[in-house]
Structure formats: structure tokens, C-alpha cells
């Protein structure tokens, strides 16, 4: 049946000189001509019908569609689709391509590469590679991996479920799982567990490593996510759409057998909020290219917001453009590490000549709106914390001032200062003096907590967190901080 339909479909694309021999051809020597005569009569009738439609269509309207061939073509495609769905086979691969290899040399993460007949089985937290190679043992070959990028941090890695990558010899194991969904592009599987929920970790442990790992596929890749969160997809959907043309797969919830020719399990990570061009496989991609991804992701939404604002506040916007005052974006904190004299600092910055926009984002704040503010700002100011990750939204050449509380020097410089410089920002770290810390009122001036914070932080993370992160506020020496703002203003109006 399918062969006959393909012959009919050929009528549509063949030239007329090829059509007639095809329809009227009769074999002179045929031992079974009686059985063939009926199909050839059908061809003749169909051809006559099509020919009459081409000639008399304007008058007789043989079909309600632009062409009679539309119906034939649609029918053929429908039947062929049904046939392909009922006979699903995995993508064919050669023996040389069948392999599992893992790189466990990285300090921050493990990563495994699979090629061949790959099939997922989420109920057993497994991904199978069925091979036609003769294995040297009748035992199943297996790798285990936790696809999260904080390998060295034992406490958090204990919360990440382990995946099994299993090689099976098709000749020895008869439980080859039938493909329910076939993918023609590779998979990248990773976890959004761990510290997901903290902005810094969402970028550092997730999005940037995902970009590093998947970039070479040029969006022709499927993301398979362990510990999937719907809110995470909603929050970063605009960015993910710039990295993949395909829908996400919830590995734990989607019980179907997904089949791939290639898969990467785990992510590459180069460092804190950065892309190391020397480790990229292409032309030396940097963190600036990742920022370009963010710009493409948020640009459509920003353009819509700009149009809406212009319609509502046309006069005010015109006045602001005329003034041409540089914008300073201030990230405001409440609770620990908050600036107790923030209002006075804002007024001082306004007197210097800045337009001030105070940002108080929470988990529900739309990232495109924050990106819009920072992308149009000359200066970003904030106290050390996860919100400083937003420096990625600043244009290269912009000024980033990070206020560094006592005991946070190393973290502030490592997590935000150095990465900001790599992005091309003019980074300035403002290290507060003991008298600018609320701890000054709690401890004697000669106490190591004030006099030698390094001796305290060396005792471990719990001391750093308990004293310097959770129990400290900042009261800026405005005269001292003013010098930094004046310098930033001078640079921003050049």
C-alpha cells in the first residue's frame, strides 16, 4: 500500500514527460498480469482526475483546495507518519561510536560522555547504552555520576541523587527497552538541585556551566533535568531558549524511554561566574559572549517595556533624556549586611549628579526588568551578597562598586570582584573599616573579630557565616565613600 502511495506522490513532482510512461507502462512479459491490471487502472483514473482538475479547476472547482495534489500529499504523509510511529527504532550507530567515557579529573565537577544507542530509564535513575560490541565480561559495565558542579563540597553533594550509566551487550541482555521518544539531537543532563534558589548558584553552578557545555551544539540539543523545578524553568526560560531549540525534559517525572545517539551527563565549569576562553573548543569564547546571550534573551521583553513606559510617561522620559544624568543602580538589603544610613547615601549620590534607582529584588522579581535597569546604568553599588551576581547584566566598561563588610574580603573578591574584571567592568571594592560595622558596637576594639577577621574566618565557614554574614550591618562613612562616588561620576560622564 505504501509503495503504491509513493508512486502516486511521484506524479506531483515528476515532469510531464515522465508521467505518461509511468502511468501507461505495460510489461510485455508478465506471468501475473491479471493481478497487476487493477492497480494500473487506478493509476489511470487518478491521473485522469488530476489532469481534468488542472484544466477545468477554475470552472468546475473539483477540489476546495488550491491543488488536488494537496489531498494526495496529505494522505500519504498521514499514513507514513502512522507507520513510523508504530515501528519506532532507535537511531543506528556504528560499533566505533558506542562508548561511555568519564572525565573525573576536575576539582569542581565530573562529566561523562555517551555515544551510541542511548536509552533513559528514570525509574531506576539509569541511562543505558546498548552495544553490539563483544564485552570482555558478562558483567554489566557501569559508571556513576552526580551531575552537579560542586563536587568538592561533600555536604551538598550528598543531597544530589546519583545516576547510573550502564553499558549492556545486546546479545547477552534481552531487556532492550523500546524507544518511546526518539531524539535526533544530543542530550545534556544536569541537576537543578543543590543550592538552586540562590541567584549566585543558579548562574555559577547552573546557567554558565550549561552554556559552556552546550554551546558547541548551536542550540541543537535537548536539556534533560534531574530534580526539575517548574519555577526555575519559568524564571530562566528566556535564557534557556537561547541555548536550546527544544523543550526541557523532566528526567524524574517523565517515565518514557527517551532515545539519543549522544549524551553528556554533567556540566563543565571553569571558575566563579566566568568562561575561560582557553578551555573552550571554539574560537575562544569569553564571559562576554554569555552576557550577549542574556541580552538576546531579555531584549524582546525590554523593548516591550520601553514602549509601554514611553506611552505612559512620555513627558517625563523626554525631560530625563534632556537632563542626561548618569544612572546609579543601588541594591538595597534589609536585615544582615544592610546599609543603615542608606537614605543619606542616596541623597549624597543625587547631589553629586546621579539619577538613583534603588533595587530590592526578591525571588519573584522578573529578571528582564532588573536587566533593563542595569543595562542602562553607568554604576552599580551593593553590599557583598548573592545579588552582586547581577553585575553580569552591566555593560562592559560600566562601574561596579562592591561594599565589602568585615570578614568577607576573600569571598567578595573571588566570587564577584575578579569575575567582574573579566567581564570588562571597572571594579572597585570598598572595604569598610571596623567603625563602619555594627560589630564595632558589640566587641572590644582589640577583639580579633574586629582587628583580625582572617584569624576568625580561618576557623571555618560556620564562623564566617554566623558572625560576618548573618550578624553584621554597615553604616557607611559618607565622607570616605563620597570620594569613590565622585570618581565614578567623573568616569560615567566622559
From Swiss-Prot:
Q: Spell out where the chain is glycosylated.
A: 375
GO biological process terms, alphabetically, are: cell wall organization; mucilage biosynthetic process; mucilage biosynthetic process involved in seed coat development
Identify the GO cellular component terms for this protein: Golgi apparatus; Golgi membrane
Record topological domains on the Cytoplasmic side: 1-40
> Which Enzyme Commission numbers does its entry carry?
2.4.-.-
Spell out the subcellular localization from the entry: Golgi apparatus membrane
Instruction: Please verify whether the record's keywords include Cell wall biogenesis/degradation.
Output: yes
The disruption phenotype is: Reduced amount and altered composition of seed coat mucilage.
Q: Name one GO molecular function term.
A: 1,4-beta-D-xylan synthase activity
Could you list which ranges are Lumenal topological domains? 62-494
Transmembrane stretches, start-end: 41-61
Q: Name any one Pfam family assigned in the record.
A: Glyco_transf_61
Say yes or no: keyword Glycoprotein present: yes
Keyword annotations from UniProtKB, A to Z: Cell wall biogenesis/degradation, Glycoprotein, Glycosyltransferase, Golgi apparatus, Membrane, Signal-anchor, Transferase, Transmembrane, Transmembrane helix
The membrane topology noted for this protein in its Swiss-Prot or TrEMBL record is: Single-pass type II membrane protein
The record's comment on protein family reads:
Belongs to the glycosyltransferase 61 family.
Known function: Glycosyletransferase required for the proper composition and structural properties of released seed coat mucilage. Required for the production of highly branched xylan polymers in seed coat mucilage. Facilitates the addition of xylose residues directly to the xylan backbone. Xylan with xylose side chains seems to be necessary for pectin attachment to the seed surface. Essential for xylan synthesis in seed coat epidermal (SCE) cells.
Q: What PANTHER family does the record point to?
A: GLYCOSYLTRANSFERASE, XYLAN GLYCOSYLTRANSFERASE MUCI21
Q: What is this protein called?
A: Xylan glycosyltransferase MUCI21
Lineage of the organism:
Eukaryota, Viridiplantae, Streptophyta, Embryophyta, Tracheophyta
Gene name of the record: MUCI21
Amino acid at each position: 500500500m505504501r509503495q503504491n502511495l509513493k508512486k502516486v506522490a511521484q506524479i506531483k513532482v515528476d515532469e510531464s514527460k515522465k508521467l505518461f510512461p509511468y502511468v501507461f507502462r505495460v510489461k510485455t512479459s508478465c506471468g501475473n498480469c491479471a493481478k497487476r491490471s487493477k492497480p494500473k487502472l487506478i493509476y489511470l483514473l487518478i491521473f485522469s482526475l488530476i489532469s481534468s482538475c488542472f484544466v477545468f479547476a477554475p470552472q468546475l472547482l473539483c477540489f476546495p483546495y488550491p491543488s488536488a495534489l494537496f489531498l494526495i500529499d496529505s494522505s500519504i504523509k498521514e499514513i507514513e507518519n502512522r507507520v513510523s510511529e508504530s515501528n519506532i527504532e532507535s537511531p543506528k550507530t556504528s560499533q566505533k561510536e558506542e562508548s561511555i567515557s568519564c572525565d573525573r579529573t576536575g576539582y569542581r565537577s565530573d562529566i561523562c560522555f555517551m555515544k551510541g544507542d542511548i536509552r533513559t530509564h528514570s525509574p531506576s535513575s539509569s541511562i543505558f547504552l546498548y552495544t553490539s560490541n563483544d564485552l570482555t565480561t558478562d558483567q554489566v559495565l557501569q559508571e556513576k555520576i552526580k551531575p552537579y558542579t560542586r563536587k568538592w563540597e561533600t555536604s551538598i553533594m550528598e543531597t544530589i541523587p546519583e545516576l547510573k550509566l550502564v553499558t549492556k551487550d545486546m546479545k547477552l541482555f534481552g531487556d532492550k527497552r523500546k524507544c518511546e521518544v526518539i531524539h535526533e539531537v544530543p542530550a545534556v543532563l544536569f541537576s537543578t538541585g543543590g543550592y538552586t534558589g540562590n541567584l549566585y548558584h543558579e548562574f555559577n553552578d547552573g546557567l554558565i556551566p550549561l552554556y559552556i557545555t552546550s554551546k558547541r551544539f548551536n542550540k541543537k540539543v535537548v536539556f534533560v533535568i534531574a530534580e526539575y523545578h517548574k519555577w526555575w524553568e519559568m524564571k530562566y526560560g528566556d535564557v534557556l531558549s537561547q541555548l536550546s531549540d527544544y523543550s526541557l525534559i523532566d528526567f524524574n517525572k517523565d517515565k518514557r524511554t527517551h532515545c539519543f545517539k549522544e549524551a553528556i551527563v554533567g556540566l563543565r565549569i571553569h571558575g566563579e561566574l566566568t568562561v575561560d576562553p582557553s578551555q573552550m573548543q571554539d574560537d575562544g569564547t569569553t564571559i562576554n559572549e554569555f552576557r550577549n546571550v542574556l541580552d538576546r534573551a531579555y531584549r524582546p521583553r525590554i523593548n516591550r517595556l520601553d514602549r509601554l513606559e514611553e506611552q505612559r510617561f512620555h513627558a517625563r522620559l523626554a525631560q530625563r533624556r534632556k537632563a542626561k544624568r548618569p544612572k546609579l543602580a543601588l541594591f538595597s538589603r534589609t536585615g544582615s549586611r544592610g546599609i543603615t544610613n542608606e537614605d543619606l547615601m542616596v541623597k549624597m549620590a543625587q547631589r553629586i549628579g546621579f539619577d538613583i534607582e534603588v533595587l530590592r529584588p526578591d525571588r519573584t522579581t522578573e529578571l528582564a526588568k532588573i536587566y533593563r535597569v542595569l543595562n542602562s546604568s553607568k554604576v552599580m553599588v551593593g553590599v557583598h551578597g548573592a545579588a552582586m551576581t547581577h553585575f553580569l547584566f552591566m555593560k562592559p566598561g560600566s562601574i561596579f562598586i562592591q561594599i565589602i563588610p568585615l570578614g568577607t574580603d576573600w569571598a567578595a573578591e573571588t566570587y564577584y570582584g575578579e569575575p567582574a574584571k573579566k567581564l570588562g567592568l571597572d571594579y572597585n571594592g570598598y572595604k569598610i573599616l571596623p567603625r563602619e560595622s555594627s560589630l564595632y558596637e558589640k566587641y572590644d576594639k582589640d577583639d580579633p573579630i574586629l582587628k583580625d577577621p582572617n584569624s576568625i574566618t580561618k576557623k571555618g565557614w560556620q564562623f564566617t557565616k554566623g558572625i560576618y554574614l548573618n550578624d553584621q550591618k554597615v553604616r557607611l562613612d559618607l565622607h570616605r565613600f563620597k570620594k569613590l562616588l565622585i570618581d565614578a561620576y567623573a568616569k560615567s560622564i566622559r
